[in-house]
Amino acid sequence: MTEQTRPLDVVILAAGQGTRMNSALPKVLHPVAGRPMVAWAVKAARDLGARKIVVVTGHGAEQVEAAVQQPGVAFARQERQLGTGDAFLSGASALTEGGADILVLYGDTPLLRPDTLRELVASHREQGSAMTVLTGELPDATGYGRIVRGEGGAVERIVEQKDASDAEKAIGEFNSGVYVFDERAPELARRIGNDNKAGEYYLTDLLGLYRAGGATVRAFRLSDPDEVLGANDRAGLTQLEATLQRRINEGHLKAGVSISLPGTVLIEDTVEIGRDVVIEPGALLRGQTRIAGGAVIGAYSVITDSVIHERAVIKAHSVLEQAEVGAGSDVGPFARLRPGSVLGEGVHIGNFVETKNARLDAGVKAGHLAYLGDVEIGAETNVGAGTIVANFDGLNKHQSKVGAGVFIGSNTTLIAPRVVGDAAFIAGGSAIHDDVPEGAMAVARGKQRNIEGWARRYWAAPERREKLAKKLPWLAGWLSRTQG
């Protein structure tokens, strides 16, 4: 086995509580750009082709394990928070095969690029190191452990912030907490002591143990120290979110997506977008959303777990969840497609139209103020303004079916379950409580009756008339003028 073909195991330390988050959610489960922070570390490990990935959990262990449970990921519990050395030993106990380099990552540093980690591992192997420390340089490295070098620039030790002298605190080179070890690390880690101010077992002490045995310890310096930024509080979380979102948006721009005002647009990492898509300011694209080429996403639209086909237009302020929009269709503005909504090609959904568990075939038009729930609507049907599919009886939802080429007049209510045949007409204002045959005209409304003088008698009642002058002066005058 050569240096370059030796397997790589990854241990991800994710046991901390994160008290400064002031949250019931474990720190590493706070989402950044669509993934929990710890899931970014798991993704990076997978991208490296790791043989085995072990996530060390502690606080909120069951929640963390449920969030990143997947094939190839194992878990180890750190029962007591005794420091990074103890956490590493917990994780190493699950590495039973041996013969691998071991990469240590943290569950709260989602900005680390897989390419950086790939270069780190390659450097470790090419230089024949027993331990390689990923370091960075900052004008003020407060909060980080410092890298103390000796003659010739060799890495001599890592000093934690709380144990550092004033001279050591002035050092700008910091320890990122990311390491590559050879296969001896678990055995050496058992010799780590806790003779420090915190009484903890520091993983950094492995450096001294390796050096004491004559092994080579080297550093690999980051070109961009922001890659190892973590989040200890909500402010740090927003900084991570902004950095990752900028990366994601820049990636889409390079891939041929037009994004107006990228700083206002949120696109989660799991979203896929085709070429020549236009995304207007304020859009939020989430989950497993897929957007095909040539589509337009209007300003302030929110799209989650949905499929948008070629040339579809989602107009401003529309909300889509678990929906599918066919090629060339347009939705909105101010429309809502709820789960189970499937629009065929060339469908028009206008302002203030809501759909749920609804299938609309090619060319259907619902232009204004409609609710279409639990319904199938055939091709080229026109749904008038104010149409409601009354699908709920107080206990159960009921399914309706409307054929192709149907004309539904404004302010119609379909009282489910109903079937409307192809090419039927429904007169405006109808409440349809029976099925409508193919080609028929359905009219279901009461005959208009005008009751002369009713308004005058209504407003002239003593309990109303005395309030008219103050609240409705024009009406009070009309009442006076029309009384005989």
UniProtKB/Swiss-Prot annotation:
NCBIfam families: glmU, PRK14358.1
Chain positions recorded as acetyl-CoA binding sites: A385, S410, G428, R445
An MF annotation (GO) of this entry: glucosamine-1-phosphate N-acetyltransferase activity
Name this protein carries in UniProt: Bifunctional protein GlmU
Cellular localization per UniProt: Cytoplasm
Enzyme Commission number: 2.7.7.23, 2.3.1.157
Quaternary organization: Homotrimer.
Pfam families: NTP_transf_3
Its biological purpose: Catalyzes the last two sequential reactions in the de novo biosynthetic pathway for UDP-N-acetylglucosamine (UDP-GlcNAc). The C-terminal domain catalyzes the transfer of acetyl group from acetyl coenzyme A to glucosamine-1-phosphate (GlcN-1-P) to produce N-acetylglucosamine-1-phosphate (GlcNAc-1-P), which is converted into UDP-GlcNAc by the transfer of uridine 5-monophosphate (from uridine 5-triphosphate), a reaction catalyzed by the N-terminal domain.
Keyword Secreted: no
Cofactor note: Binds 1 Mg(2+) ion per subunit.
GO biological process, alphabetically ordered: cell morphogenesis; cell wall organization; lipid A biosynthetic process; peptidoglycan biosynthetic process; regulation of cell shape; UDP-N-acetylglucosamine biosynthetic process
Keyword terms: Acyltransferase, Cell shape, Cell wall biogenesis/degradation, Cytoplasm, Magnesium, Metal-binding, Multifunctional enzyme, Nucleotidyltransferase, Peptidoglycan synthesis, Repeat, Transferase
Region of interest: Pyrophosphorylase: 1-234
Ranges where the record places region Linker: 235-255
Catalysed reactions, as listed in the record: alpha-D-glucosamine 1-phosphate + acetyl-CoA = N-acetyl-alpha-D-glucosamine 1-phosphate + CoA + H(+); N-acetyl-alpha-D-glucosamine 1-phosphate + UTP + H(+) = UDP-N-acetyl-alpha-D-glucosamine + diphosphate
UniProt family annotation: In the N-terminal section; belongs to the N-acetylglucosamine-1-phosphate uridyltransferase family.
